[in-house]
Amino acid sequence: MKINCSTIENKYLRIKTLNIGATLFEVFYKEKKVNLILNLGSKDNYKSKNFYVGSTCGRFAGRISKSKFIIGNKKYKLNNNEGNNILHGGKKGFDRIIWKKIKHSKQKIVYKIESPHKDQGFPGNLIVKCIYQLKNNNFFIKYEYFSDKLTHVNLTNHSYWNLNLNKKNDIFNHDLKINANQYLEVNNYLIPTGKIKSVSNSINDFRKYSNIGKKIKLNFLKKVKKISKTINQSGFDLTYVINKKIDYFVASLKNRDSKIKVDVYSDLPGVQLYTSQSLKYKKKLFPYQGLCLETQFFPEAPNIKKFPSTLTKPHKLYKYFTKFIIK
């Protein structure tokens, strides 16, 4: 397995990516001279399984209960990797695959993967492109895909943001705003129940800037509940239903000390907030060191009809974008 690093940059930002998992390895903000996301240090560290650090998750980001769904009259059994459930595409999801780099210009990188029929149990031969693109102090992550059969697809990038100048500091000094009046209720295994709940009068309300550290300390740290290696309810791991707006605004994250701010925009219907309570990698990464804002469709969507559909029609091209503005 040969892992290669590629770079695009302009006068504002330098973006580094890896071909394994079409991974976002670095977002270097030149004005502050700091990388804004976590990584594993060396690119060779990505050869082993990790906490999806910067990776593209697929074929289906998030969880699907009992690792199965039905299309038409046919039931599909998927390769479970979290108890009886499947998380982020299975045991060998897109994060573990070497993607082919098909384009590399000064401000754009395009990766491509061809996922065969029944890959991790999913139907259809699926072709996916992951595009990283720079424009001034903005950078884009775009996904394009099509299949030759009816199938379910949900892609996201799993970067851990940390806007501190020193990455040894946690995210408790970060303030977050999410453009969402609602979130998905989940069970103890973080599987959506199908109920969509209001954020009003709850700890899940981020409609105005709220301090991450204060929310976690008040609501989680005194009642830590760890169910498994990947299910730790001592922080946020929740899907928000983005309010529909013309400008596609999703969320804004800012740091009180560094004064750095990241605004997120996307045409996808949800965003997964994860505060890295389970994160651990050697002596480099630790819990609450990063914050994920994973723009995506809803977990468990193949089994809940009222959720925005993730069903892809044969030979139809699907395109989605997420934009990050660094200030």
Question: What label would you give each PLM region?
Answer:
Residues M1-K327:
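An exposed, glycine/acidic-rich loop-and-rim segment of catalytic or binding clefts
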